[in-house]
Swiss-Prot record:
Transmembrane segments: none
Protein name from the UniProt record: Aminopeptidase C
Catalytic activity: Inactivates bleomycin B2 (a cytotoxic glycometallopeptide) by hydrolysis of a carboxyamide bond of beta-aminoalanine, but also shows general aminopeptidase activity. The specificity varies somewhat with source, but amino acid arylamides of Met, Leu and Ala are preferred
Annotated source species: Lactococcus lactis subsp. cremoris (Streptococcus cremoris)
SUPFAM superfamilies reported for this sequence: Cysteine proteinases
GO cellular component, as recorded: cytoplasm
Amino acid sequence: MTVTSDFTQKLYENFAENTKLRAVENAVTKNGLLSSLEVRGSHAANLPEFSLDLTKDPVTNQKQSGRCWMFAALNTFRHKFINEFKTEDFEFSQAYTFFWDKYEKSNWFMEQIIGDVAMDDRRLKFLLQTPQQDGGQWDMMVAIFDKYGIVPKAVYPESQASSSSRELNQYLNKLLRQDAEILRYTIEQDGDVQAVKEELLQEVFNFLAVTLGLPPQNFEFAFRNKDNEYKKFVGTPKEFYNEYVGIDLNNYVSVINAPTADKPYNKSYTVEFLGNVVGGKEVKHLNVEMDRFKKLAIAQMQAGETVWFGCDVGQESNRSAGLLTMDSYDFKSSLDIEFTQSKAGRLDYGESLMTHAMVLAGVDLDADGNSTKWKVENSWGKDAGQKGYFVASDEWMDEYTYQIVVRKDLLSEEELAAYEAKPQVLLPWDPMGALA
């Protein structure tokens, strides 16, 4: 239908007759939408106390960057380091992994560009839209750890560009789109593509070294623990990982909950074009039902390990209060609006996808062992939430959490076989390919 002036006039009249909406209009225009609709009772119902609580370590801060997936992964290692080596506080360098991820993503992008994707193919347009970005997924982080190791933050500290990455991304993507044209032209002219690509990668490396700083190949690091014991390390980043973390990351798998019709449960999935290290670990997910998803996360925490997880953090989120709940805001009583889409509907119609990775650091269980709320360690600094920690209600977890990483030995034989089977390849723009 065409929107006529008579129809619009009727809407005006309907609104004017609704005294409740006029009152809400005054509140919202003065105070903002969410501040006006906030439900105070949700605070009392989600107090930050948990029957299983794995850490109270100070939180980290990704600042103005999209490195949450790195922070979450390194935070899981960090808790292990602090506990085993009895340190007051400690951080691994998030800037170090950031450097190598940018470098590898640039090479990954170039490899896709010199493939056989036609210029008018939507997949090529997808690649060129964002040649690289800050975000990533767990398996991409594993690929970086496997190849480059890790270093302490004191050895490779933050730079302006790692803490605020907008300019870096703007000009690195500008460079990579130019490189894409150069590589395509070289192919058309039957030139030496690999030789040209190596020259272009040198430019990328130089750009990253200038903006982020040259990462160490060997280093020394010393510290004293709470017992005043002195420890010193001399070696490479990979040797440091092996000595001070020592986790075999091949023993961990990505588990998702994607209840859409195109993704049957108990099957594995990967996403076309998604990755960073050519020849590195493939991004791969096992899709399970939500009840099983939560039981796996609980089992890992009961074994003493925190859990890396990915979610849509902007949904029903009260950042200042540190709450992720379905009743944080009341649209129905105030605006006569209800949001009734299912999790599958939100995925299918573009309303939701994974936007952020954090750490599950605790859970509150009822008498039957079922979860009621979850302790979430964020990476937005101590001023967000409750000293950097958030509380997620169990219902919010059901609706807006999409991915966890758990030990393989927690899977059943059937689940492990499904994970290890050849994965179904999803389209590049599938929501399960979203980067945290």
